[in-house]
Design a protein with these regions (language model features):
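A domain-start/cap signature at the N-terminus of enzymes
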Residues: 25-66, 330
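Active-site machinery of serine-nucleophile hydrolases
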Residues: 75-126
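C-terminal catalytic histidine-bearing segment of alpha/beta-hydrolase fold enzymes
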Residues: 213, 223-226, 233-301, 378, ...
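Short beta-strand element of the alpha/beta-hydrolase
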Residues: 63-75
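Gly/Ser-rich "nucleophile elbow"/oxyanion-hole loop immediately N-terminal to the catalytic nucleophile
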Residues: 59, 114-153
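The feature captures the conserved acid-bearing segment of alpha/beta-hydrolase catalytic domains
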Residues: 183-238, 242-245
Length: 396
């Protein structure tokens, strides 16, 4: 009887597990819905249909705007969608939620203007990107202004051409295994004459290569071009060169994307250390730096809060007045941030100013109402602790 009950329990658990897996599978399949966007243009002889892969929050966070990633290869869609979902689902860290656009399939009319550009016969491809493709995506979807171009082999080489010939199209380029040797665009010559003259604005260019049999014929040209780009890069242009030697050829775009995404959004996620050149200049310099990142590099707000908190923490013991002033500036800059008020409350508490600690922590609790339950619970517990300490202190 005991054995039967055990078997029955195992069977029930198994059924529940299968049901759970089924529900999870259904949820997962709906996380990144794909829509179609048809774009007609006088520059292309037939309409081009694109797959638009939307991030998980797109339909629910209707006031949110998103990064754009474009890749010319239709089969890159599952790769980008899967990597993006995995790398963004844990708090958009390291990959900020992104709209991914790829052609639905091969299109002869688009291929024609692509070939004309590669062969140096016309600039229709540049005009198509500037006049039709990117404006239509922006018209139909909520973009925040930051645009990434991704390409592999020939498409990577074309991406370098786009950067040099029309640098305002994209903010970042992920160029994996670019076919640079004897390329009709003569990219090494373009780099030598055009790269240093690009407009002085922030941009990111990742170029990667391997020693695979498919890449070997392009290694010498790759080394030449990347050396030129590293030397000639305009101010605020970050050139990132990677060699993924020993890895398979078809793994290159996966590796390139992983590395590049971390670098592209590093300034969003990583706070300035207190001993950095900018932080040493103080809170105002930190705020100015993040204003530059927001307005010039990304086109959306990048918070300075964690950098301000780090600087204040480093000064709290030996320069408490300076530390509190920094944290007060943080709450002035981010008055709706529970994290800003919590940091100031913690500073007051450490300095045994319990009354002010309670007042600030109450604001932290108030502004935490829209945060996940963990933060609501944690901040309420801190408020109780601060209040109890204040009461005990008053009773002494």
């Amino acid at each position: 009887m005991v054995k039967f009950a055990s078997y029955l329990m195992l069977a029930m658990l198994g059924t529940i597990s299968l049901l759970s897996l089924s529900v999870c599978a259904t949820d997962i399949s709906a996380l990144n819905p794909i829509e179609e966007l048809t774009i007609s243009s006088e520059l292309v002889d037939a309409p081009v249909i694109y797959n638009v892969t939307l991030p998980a929050s797109y339909q629910t966070k209707t006031d949110k705007r998103y990064v754009l990633l474009f890749d010319i290869h239709p089969r890159s869609q599952p790769m980008h969608a899967g990597m993006h979902d995995w790398m963004s689902h844990n708090g958009a860290w390291p990959w900020l939620e992104t709209i991914i656009v790829t052609p639905k399939n091969y299109n002869e009319a688009f291929a024609a203007i692509y070939a004309e550009y590669v062969e140096g016969k016309s600039t229709k491809l540049l005009e198509y990107f500037a006049q039709d493709l990117l404006p239509n995506i922006a018209k139909n979807y909520r973009l925040n202004g930051f645009k990434i171009y991704s390409g592999f082999t020939g498409n990577a080489a074309v991406g370098l051409g786009l950067l040099l010939d029309q640098p305002d199209l994209f903010n970042a380029y992920i160029l994996a295994s670019p076919t640079l040797n004897n390329h009709p665009l003569k990219l090494h010559e373009k780099v030598a004459t055009q790269f240093s003259k690009l407009p002085n604005k922030p941009r990111y260019v990742a170029l990667s290569m391997s020693d695979s049999s498919y890449d070997k014929s392009h290694l010498a040209a790759f080394e030449q071009v990347t050396a030129q780009m590293t030397l000639l890069a305009p101010e605020h242009t970050q050139v990132s060169v990677q060699r993924f030697d020993g890895n398979y050829y078809m793994t290159q775009p996966v590796l390139a994307t992983s590395y590049a995404i971390e670098e592209i959004f590093n300034d969003v996620h990583q706070a300035l250390t207190p001993d950095s050149a900018i932080a040493k200049q103080g809170a105002d310099a930190i705020l100015a730096h993040y204003q530059f990142l927001s307005a010039e590099k990304y086109g959306f707000e990048v918070s300075a809060l964690n950098s301000l908190k780090a600087l204040a923490k480093s000064k709290l013991e030996n320069e408490p007045e300076t530390a509190i002033a920094i944290l007060q500036k943080a709450t002035q800059q981010y008055p709706e941030s529970a994290f800003a008020h919590e940091a100031l409350a913690a500073g007051y508490f450490q300095l045994k100013d319990y009354k002010k600690a309670v007042a600030e922590q109450k604001l932290a609790v108030e502004h935490a109402k829209d945060l996940v339950p963990y933060w609501q619970r944690t901040y309420q517990e801190k408020l109780s602790k601060y209040q109890q300490t204040l009461n005990n202190h008053a009773a002494e």
